[in-house]
């Protein structure tokens, strides 16, 4: 894709500011009022600190996808993710994180860059994300990958697809086991042994099993090493056959937590799901 002309870039910047302002109510709901990018001149939206490459990608792809959508709520969701992405990019740059220079933002003859393709995919997922609490975390994906040259673009697409496929409650479960409350989990396991309980039933049980199937949640072995569900004798029939204190994120699970900033999920949301897990 060719370079933007000054007039085109300015027009897109105005459109980006407008669409973010049109999404302000939803931005406040899912980001807690932490996003502050709509002020100032339209041409400077995102700020120089956000990085030229990522700002151009967000501006160009964001406006294009937004204008394709006909449903107002879908447009608001896309505007919210764009605001989050710009804010995260600016914060990372302010922290001194360097934008990757391995070709992630480079387009070829008749081909878009990996960054543009990934952002379009994330925005189209966001447009249909009826669990709108996920939007803050979908918006984190591009800025995270922009500073992670250790993650190949193909892996980035896989992570984005996983984030789209998971439910909000699965996001929260991953956040819990990013820093598991081991004492509470141990007490739960003792109670289950005494009472002969089987843990929660219904949807939550299935969602946790699915995290194991996806390779995001695993179990520790006798050496304390984390492996996939099925790698130990007691996990052969599924993760619920293993004491909860031994549940751990796999390498892939930790990667998704980092890229989608799931560690930012509130204590209130974690406690609610954790209480259901411990029931």
Predicted regions, residues:
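Membrane-inserting effector segments that mediate pore formation, membrane fusion
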Residues: 7-83
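Eukaryotic partner-binding/assembly regions in large regulatory complexes
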Residues: 57-145
């Amino acid at each position: 894709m060719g370079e933007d002309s000054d007039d085109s870039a300015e027009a897109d910047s105005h459109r980006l500011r407008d669409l973010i302002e049109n999404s302000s109510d939803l931005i406040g709901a899912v980001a807690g009022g932490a996003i502050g990018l709509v002020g100032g001149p339209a041409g400077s939206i995102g700020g120089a600190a956000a990085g030229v490459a990522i700002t151009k990608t967000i501006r160009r792809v964001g406006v294009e996808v937004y204008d394709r959508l006909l449903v107002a709520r879908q447009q608001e969701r896309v505007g919210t993710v764009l605001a989050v992405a710009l804010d995260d990019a600016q914060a990372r740059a302010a922290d001194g994180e360097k934008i990757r220079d391995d070709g992630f933002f480079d387009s070829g003859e008749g081909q878009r860059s990996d960054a543009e393709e990934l952002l379009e995919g994330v925005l189209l997922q966001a447009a249909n994300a009826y669990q709108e609490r996920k939007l803050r975390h979908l918006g984190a994906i591009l800025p995270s990958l922009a500073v992670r040259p250790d993650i190949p673009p193909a892996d980035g697409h896989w992570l984005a697809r996983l984030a789209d496929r998971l439910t909000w409650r699965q996001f929260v479960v991953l956040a819990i086991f990013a820093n598991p409350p081991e004492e509470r989990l141990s007490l739960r396991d003792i109670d289950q042994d005494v009472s002969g309980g089987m843990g929660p039933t219904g949807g939550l049980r299935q969602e946790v099993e699915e995290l194991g199937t996806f390779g995001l949640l695993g179990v520790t072995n006798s050496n304390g090493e984390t492996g996939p569900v099925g790698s130990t004798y007691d996990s052969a029939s599924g993760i619920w056959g293993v004491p909860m204190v031994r549940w751990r994120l796999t390498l892939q699970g930790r990667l998704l937590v980092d890229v989608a900033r799931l560690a930012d999920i509130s204590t209130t949301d974690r406690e609610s799901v954790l209480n259901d897990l411990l029931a």
